[in-house]
C-alpha cells in the first residue's frame, strides 16, 4: 500500500507496505502508454503513508510512518532526474498528510502525530520549494488524517478522512482559498470514509475506495464544483483503501492498496476508470 502522484506523465508510487514490512523505501512508476512499471531510485528513508505531490520538475515526499500507521518521521525529500535530494525537515514528525500543489507552493494539511498517543492534527502548512521554507496557514476545520485533497480553479478541496481512527470517519468537505486564507464548507461527500483516492477528472472531483468500521469501500462518487452536488458512478472492480489514485490523460489509475481493513493484506492490482 502506497500513495501516489502524477509526475511527468506517469503514476509514481512512493513508500508503503510490502513484503511483510511497513517501511519500504520503494519508488515505482507506471507508464499508461506502455502498460509497464519501472523501479526507480528508492526513498532515502522508507515509510508508509508518505505524503506525495509533484510541482514543476520535482516529485516531493513528506513524512510518513515508520511503524504500521504510527511513529512518524519528519524527513522531506525531492526526486528530480535520477536521484532524491534531502530538503528542510517538517516542523514536527507527521504521517498521512494530505499534500497538493497550488501555484508555486505545496499545501500540507492534517495528518497524524505521536506513537503511543497517536492523534489527528489540524495543521495547515505551505512549503515553498524556492526558499525551502514552511509557512503556516488557517488550520483545517477539523483535525483529520487519511483525507482526500485536490486543487481546482485556484482553491484546495479537502474531503472526508478520519479523526484518530477509521471508526470515526468524516464526510466533511471544505475548500480553502489562499487569497483570503479562509475555509468554506461545501456539500459533504455521501459516503464518509478515509484512506480513499481523490482526483480531478473531466471537470469533477472523483473519490473512490477507502475504509471504515468492518469494511472496505468500493463506492465511486464525483463532485461537481459548479453545482455543489455529488453523484455516484460505477464502483471499483476491486474495493481497496490506501491505494495510489492518479489521473493521467483521460483515465484514472488506481494501483495497490489493501482489499481488507487495516494493513495485513496487500494488493498489487492496478485498474483504470474512464468515462465513455
Residue positions per predicted region:
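Kelch-like beta-propeller repeat domains
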Residues: 1-276
